[in-house]
A protein has these predicted regions:
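Ligand-binding pockets and gating/stacking loops
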Residues: 1-485
């Protein structure tokens, strides 16, 4: 049997000996093997179409160039934070006068109306009504657009999260961050285009479904980074490989990668993994600088709440989000711990703690972007996958009271990137249960977001198995023009 290799290839022994770089030269092959890509099953090829992260021009003039999503997993209570309902106070403790309550947790269900524990007041020139739990958000009321009429109708956390993140209620589909990155690429070569920051305690609930590329090419998957240093593990090479040795390694690996890619056109998983390792090399300096907030002035650190016990962690992540966008990252998402806003019980003590952790950093992010001239081109989003019910759950004493899921009417806010500041849009019924005026479903939400980036939601598509697939899932969707400046 002939041992002669195809033209242009060399044996492993010759590679090591001729290269003179030792076993470190096998790093890429080892990493690819660990990722299962060298022995991956054969997949349908995509032809010679090239998928990359080079910056791209939207087909229409666009105000938004980047987005920061502060995703509040669990479902913040709209009637306690954003949507005051005097009727709840009036009927507190009485039986809900209707029969259209849809519980997610029937075992702990109650028909007793639960009034809010907190007062509302007006803020800004616009007079936006916000809870006393959000005093800092009130300082930027004239810059945010509050939507009180969100609706998805999907009452389970996973499906509701998927609806808001991907436009579909099943897993395995691209998130909005992946779509935006696919459409526009990145403004930086030295940092990931799409970054997701988790909580110090680990991965979020439902993990990578928050940043999945789904069936889009793998290069558009989000990069998950740790909340605390080191934010990206294993970024530094051994001391013996730093400098010129590493440069020589990368030069040879690039040549080999190019030849391998030419023989495997359309294999996007392999191409994406190779590009991710090349990006890791460039990130060795850029990422450290971007994630290092020690150079920020004292007044900026204080603005975000860095050093405050109640909000230090979230303050640091919001500040890093600004620094990433400032350096050309296209899409950043900041996730909370688990489903911390899922207030089935102890809402009286849990909600103030959650608000104290997020209110100051969230408001500071808006104010800081505005001060730097970045808010006009950066969308800031604050919201979760659902809201809460107007009746109490866990009727075991006031300290135990909570609220069940509600996806038929909930609130979220957005700022910058073409959205109209100081606007309160939409209404729920007098109980805060159902959106009844100017309803915005998740398809409308995504269509409006894409419009801010310069795309028509039904024109930004990816062809798969003969179908032209879109973020809005080929469903009727409207761009909510009233939200836009």
């Amino acid at each position: 049997m002939s041992t002669k290799l195809p033209h242009g290839l060399c044996s492993r022994r010759h590679f090591i000996e001729a290269g003179g770089f030792g076993l470190g030269m096998l790093g890429l092959a080892t990493l690819l093997r660990q990722d299962g890509l060298l022995a991956a099953p054969i997949k349908p090829l995509l032809g010679n179409e090239v998928f990359d992260l080079l910056p791209k021009q939207a087909p229409r003039p666009a105000k938004a160039k980047a987005m920061i999503s502060l995703f509040m997993m669990g479902g913040p209570s709209q009637m306690d934070l954003f949507d005051p309902k005097p009727m709840l106070t009036k009927w507190h403790g009485q039986k809900f006068p209707g029969d259209n309550l849809k519980y997610d947790n029937v075992a702990q269900a109650s028909a007793k109306v639960l009034g809010s524990f907190w007062k509302f007041s007006r803020h800004g020139k616009c007079g936006m009504e916000l809870s006393e739990l959000l005093p800092q958000l009130g300082t930027v009321a004239d810059d945010i657009c509050l939507i009180r009429s969100m609706k998805s109708g999907v009452n389970n956390h996973l499906q509701a999260m998927l609806a808001m993140q991907t436009g579909r209620i099943t897993g395995g589909n691209p998130t909005m961050g992946a779509w935006v990155t696919y459409a526009l690429g990145s403004e930086t070569k030295d940092l990931p285009a799409y970054v997701v920051m988790g909580h110090p305690n680990g991965l979020p609930t439902f993990a990578n479904q928050h940043w999945s590329n789904g069936w889009l090419p793998s290069i558009y998957q989000g990069t998950f980074v740790r909340a605390t240093a080191p934010h990206i593990l294993n970024l530094d090479p051994p001391a013996s490989l730093q400098g010129k040795p590493q440069e020589r390694q990368m030069e040879l690996l690039r040549a080999m990668n190019a030849e391998h890619a030419a023989n495997h056109p359309g294999e996007t998983d392999l191409q994406a993994r190779i590009q991710s390792y090349e990006l890791a090399g460039r990130m060795q300096l850029a990422a450290k600088e971007a994630f290092d907030i020690s150079s920020e002035p004292k007044h900026v650190l204080e603005l975000y709440g860095v050093g405050r016990k109640e909000c230090d962690d979230y303050a640091r992540r919001c500040l890093i989000a600004r620094r990433l966008v400032e350096r050309g990252v296209r899409y950043v998402q900041v996730l909370n711990q688990g489903q911390s806003w899922d207030s089935h019980s102890v809402i009286k003590t849990a909600l103030p703690t959650l608000c104290a952790a997020t209110d100051r950093p969230s408001a500071a992010l808006v104010a800081d972007l505005k001060q730097r001239g970045l808010l006009d081109s950066t969308i800031v989003h604050w919201g979760g996958e659902m809201g809460r019910m107007p009746v109490l759950q866990n009727d075991a004493g006031e300290a135990k009271w909570g609220r069940d899921h509600n996806t038929y009417g909930f609130s979220q806010w957005v700022a910058g990137g073409g959205f109209k500041g100081g606007l309160t849009y939409g209404e729920t019924d007098e109980w805060g249960h159902h959106a009844v005026k100017d309803v915005v479903n998740h398809y409308d939400w995504h269509a409006t977001m894409l419009d801010c980036f310069g795309f028509e939601h039904d024109k930004l598509v990816y062809k798969r198995n003969g179908a032209a697939l879109a973020l809005t899932n080929n469903q009727p969707a409207r761009v909510v023009r009233e939200l836009l400046a």
